[in-house]
């Protein structure tokens, strides 16, 4: 498949008009074919400027979000991911729900072999919340990998003063 064919379904990348959506919007996510589906490899996104709203107070919440996955046939297009995460800006939800929803939306889009999403939210009221979501494709080695990474994901927590 040529690069031009591969990118024909990408509507956001290279667009002169970037549609910034201010409400939760999973339909903005786009994918492209993984040319290296014969390899297991990680793709990692570091998203240090995530914002959402507290569903009770309406106050802004800030986080760094780390998304890592082992693709199968599809990869997420990074500009669409940026716009998708931006769509949470005026979305009111708890930290745990945001991270789980992001993970589930990406699993639905990509059907990856493995995926994890880790949110590191800045403290509010003196407490920081760091929800972690992961997924391993059922009945494969990735299901076992997900279980092991879930059990061990935070064995060496960082100092709290890093935020």
Swiss-Prot record:
GO molecular function: preQ1 synthase activity
Gene: queF
Family designation: Belongs to the GTP cyclohydrolase I family. QueF type 1 subfamily.
InterPro entries: GTP-CH-I_C/QueF, NADPH_dep_7-cyano-7-deazaG_red, QueF, QueF_type1
Functional pathway: tRNA modification; tRNA-queuosine biosynthesis
Single GO cellular component term: cytoplasm
SUPFAM superfamilies from the UniProt entry: Tetrahydrobiopterin biosynthesis enzymes-like
UniProt protein name: NADPH-dependent 7-cyano-7-deazaguanine reductase
EC number assigned by the record: 1.7.1.13
NCBIfam families per UniProt: QueF-II
Primary localisation category: cytoplasm
Keywords: Cytoplasm, NADP, Oxidoreductase, Queuosine biosynthesis
Subcellular location: Cytoplasm
Pfam families: QueF
Reaction(s) the record says it catalyses: 7-aminomethyl-7-carbaguanine + 2 NADP(+) = 7-cyano-7-deazaguanine + 2 NADPH + 3 H(+)
S-S pairs: none
GO biological process: queuosine biosynthetic process; tRNA modification
Known function: Catalyzes the NADPH-dependent reduction of 7-cyano-7-deazaguanine (preQ0) to 7-aminomethyl-7-deazaguanine (preQ1).
Organism, scientific name: Streptococcus thermophilus (strain ATCC BAA-250 / LMG 18311)
Positions annotated as active site in the UniProt record: 54 (thioimide intermediate), 61 (proton donor)
Highest taxon in the source lineage: Bacteria
């Amino acid at each position: 498949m040529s690069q031009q064919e591969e990118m024909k379904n990408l509507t956001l990348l290279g667009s002169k008009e970037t549609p910034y959506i201010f409400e939760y919007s999973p339909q903005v996510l786009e994918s492209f074919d993984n040319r290296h589906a014969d390899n297991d490899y990680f793709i990692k996104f570091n998203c240090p400027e995530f914002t959402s709203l507290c569903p009770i107070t309406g106050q802004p919440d800030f986080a760094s979000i780390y998304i890592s996955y082992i693709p199968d046939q599809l990869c997420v297009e990074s500009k669409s991911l940026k716009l998708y995460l931006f769509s949470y800006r005026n979305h009111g939800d708890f930290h745990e729900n945001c991270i789980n929803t992001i993970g589930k939306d990406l699993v639905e889009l990509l059907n990856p072999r493995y995926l994890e999403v880790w949110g590191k939210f800045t403290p509010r009221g003196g407490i920081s919340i760091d929800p972690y979501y992961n997924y391993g494709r059922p009945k494969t080695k990735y299901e076992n990998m997900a279980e092991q990474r879930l059990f061990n994901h935070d064995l060496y927590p960082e100092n709290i003063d890093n935020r």
